[in-house]
C-alpha cells in the first residue's frame, strides 16, 4: 500500500514538472520569436533595450515605416551610423568613406613590359589568346566588355593574397604587407564591377558566361600561382595592359558619340570622390588609371620573383592608387 502511494505521488510530481516545463518552454519560445535570440537573450538584454525592441517590432508589424529593416541580435551588434564630411548620411554598406580616394590620372598609360624570357612570352601570349574570344563576343559593346573584364580581374589579387596569407601562417612570418596590398587590388576591381553593373545591365546569358569564365579562371590562376608566382603576376600585368587598351577604346567610342555619355553612377561618385555632375567618361578615366596602377604592382611583383627574392623582402605598395 505504501509503495503504491509513493508511486502515485511520484507520478503527480512528474506530471507537475512536465506541466511547468511546457509552460516555461512556451514562454521561452515567445521570447525567442520576439527578440530573435535564445534563452540567454532574456537574461542579457536590459529592460530598456527590450522596450525599444518591442516598440520597433510593434511599429514594423503595424505597418509603420516599411523601408526600415529591424534586425534584432542577441549579440548586441548595431551598425554604426556613418556620415559624409557635409553631414549627410553615408548610404553604402559595401565600402566606407575612409576607403574612398581620388584616382591619380597622371600615371603613365603607355608603359609596357617587353616579354624577354620564356615565361614572359608565355604569359604575354596567354593574354593575347584570351582576348580574341572576348573581341568576337562583345565587339564594341564596351560596357558589357568592362563587366566581363572586371569579373576576371578581381580574381588574381584574391588568389595571390589568399596563398600568401596561408604561406605566412605556415612559415610563422610576415608577408611584408603584400597580403593586404593584393586584397586591396581585388576589392578595387570588384568596385569597378559594381560600378559598371549600374551602366551595363547584363543579360541572362552574359551572367551565365561570367559564372563559367570565373570558375575556370579562378582554378587555372590558382594552379598557375602555385606553380610559378612570377608567371602569374606577369600574366596579370599583361592582362591589365589589355584592360588599359580596352578602356582607351571605350573612351574613343564615348567621344565619337557611339556610346551615350550618361551621368556617373552615384556609387562611382562616392568611391572615387568625383565632383557632382560627373559622367560615364569620368568614370572610365579613373578606372583606366586604376588598371595602370595594378599593372605596375603586378609587374613589380614578378620582377621581385625574377630576382630570386620573396615578396615579403620588398615593401608592398599598400594604398597605391
Curated annotation (Swiss-Prot):
Membrane-topology descriptor: Multi-pass membrane protein
CDD domains: AOX
Transmembrane segments annotated in the record for this chain: 146-166, 208-228
Triggers of expression: By salicylic acid.
Recorded family membership: Belongs to the alternative oxidase family.
EC number: 1.10.3.11
Record's keyword annotation contains Oxidoreductase: yes
Cofactor: Fe cation
The protein, known as: Ubiquinol oxidase 1, mitochondrial
PANTHER family the record matches: ALTERNATIVE OXIDASE
Lineage: Eukaryota, Viridiplantae, Streptophyta, Embryophyta, Tracheophyta
Keywords noted in UniProt: Disulfide bond, Electron transport, Iron, Membrane, Metal-binding, Mitochondrion, Mitochondrion inner membrane, Oxidoreductase, Respiratory chain, Transit peptide, Transmembrane, Transmembrane helix, Transport
EC class name: oxidoreductase
Main location: mitochondrion
Transit sequence range: 1-41
Catalytic activity: 2 a ubiquinol + O2 = 2 a ubiquinone + 2 H2O
Domain of life: Eukaryota
Sites where the protein binds Fe cation 2: 189, 240, 291, 294
Regulation: When the two monomeric subunits are covalently linked by a S-S bond, the enzyme is essentially inactive. When the disulfide bond is reduced, its component sulfhydryls can associate with K-keto acids through formation of a thiohemiacetal, resulting in enzyme activation. Pyruvate increases Vmax, but not the substrate affinity.
Subcellular location: Mitochondrion inner membrane
Amino acid at each position: 500500500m505504501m509503495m503504491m502511494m509513493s508511486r502515485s505521488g511520484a507520478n503527480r510530481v512528474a506530471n507537475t514538472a512536465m506541466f511547468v516545463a511546457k509552460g516555461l518552454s512556451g514562454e521561452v519560445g515567445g521570447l525567442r520569436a520576439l527578440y530573435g535570440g535564445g534563452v540567454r537573450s532574456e537574461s542579457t538584454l536590459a529592460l530598456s533595450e527590450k522596450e525599444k525592441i518591442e516598440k520597433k517590432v510593434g511599429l514594423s508589424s503595424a505597418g509603420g515605416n516599411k523601408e526600415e529593416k529591424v534586425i534584432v541580435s542577441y549579440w548586441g551588434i548595431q551598425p554604426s551610423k556613418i556620415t559624409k564630411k557635409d553631414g549627410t548620411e553615408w548610404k553604402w554598406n559595401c565600402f566606407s568613406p575612409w576607403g574612398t580616394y581620388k584616382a591619380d590620372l597622371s600615371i603613365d598609360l603607355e608603359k609596357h613590359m617587353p616579354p624577354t624570357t620564356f615565361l614572359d612570352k608565355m604569359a604575354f601570349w596567354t593574354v593575347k589568346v584570351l582576348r580574341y574570344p572576348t573581341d568576337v563576343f562583345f565587339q564594341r559593346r564596351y560596357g558589357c566588355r568592362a563587366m566581363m573584364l572586371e569579373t576576371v580581374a578581381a580574381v588574381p589579387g584574391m588568389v595571390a593574397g589568399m596563398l600568401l596569407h596561408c604561406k605566412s601562417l605556415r612559415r610563422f612570418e610576415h608577408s611584408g604587407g603584400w597580403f593586404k596590398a593584393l586584397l586591396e587590388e581585388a576589392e578595387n576591381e570588384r568596385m569597378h564591377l559594381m560600378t559598371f553593373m549600374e551602366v551595363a545591365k547584363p543579360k541572362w546569358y552574359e551572367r551565365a558566361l561570367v559564372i563559367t569564365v570565373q570558375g575556370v579562371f579562378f582554378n587555372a590562376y590558382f594552379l598557375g600561382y602555385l606553380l610559378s608566382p612570377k608567371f602569374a603576376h606577369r600574366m596579370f600585368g599583361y592582362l591589365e595592359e589589355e584592360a588599359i587598351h580596352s578602356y582607351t577604346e571605350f573612351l574613343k567610342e564615348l567621344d565619337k558619340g557611339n556610346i551615350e555619355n550618361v551621368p556617373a553612377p552615384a556609387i562611382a561618385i562616392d568611391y572615387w570622390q568625383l565632383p557632382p555632375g560627373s559622367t560615364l567618361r569620368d568614370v572610365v578615366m579613373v578606372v583606366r588609371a586604376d588598371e595602370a596602377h595594378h599593372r605596375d604592382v603586378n609587374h613589380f611583383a614578378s620582377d621581385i620573383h625574377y630576382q630570386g627574392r620573396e615578396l615579403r623582402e620588398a615593401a608592398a605598395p599598400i594604398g597605391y592608387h
